[in-house]
């Protein structure tokens, strides 16, 4: 089992049902593993900031942590505005970023 497979399996075991993501080369193993985890639905966005804000809204409404998956470099930093907003309001969020190495 790859680490990427373990991440999504574990989150699914913990009750995660939705992930907000932007695909990218640095996160391809994560994207591939997520596509094979049948218990989690993914919502593709066009920008990482939108993923983080959607996850924050999801967490506020559902009471479950919002989960974000982004690619490396700018993908991770683009999500920061939404992450800081969630942190300031104590909204639970899990952010996973790919890594090239």
Question: Predicted regions span which residues?
Answer:
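N-terminal alpha/beta PP-like core and its mobile active-site loop of ThDP/TPP-dependent enzymes
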Residues: 1-101
């Amino acid at each position: 089992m790859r680490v990427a497979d373990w991440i999504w399996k574990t989150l699914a075991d913990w009750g995660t049902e939705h992930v907000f993501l932007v695909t990218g080369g640095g996160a391809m193993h994560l994207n591939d593993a997520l596509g094979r985890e049948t218990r989690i639905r993914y919502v593709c966005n066009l920008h990482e900031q939108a993923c983080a804000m959607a996850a924050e809204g999801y967490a506020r409404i559902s009471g479950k942590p919002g989960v974000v998956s982004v690619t490396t470099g700018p993908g991770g930093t683009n999500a920061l505005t939404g992450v800081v907003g969630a942190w300031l309001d104590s909204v639970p969020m899990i952010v996973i970023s790919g890594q090239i190495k």
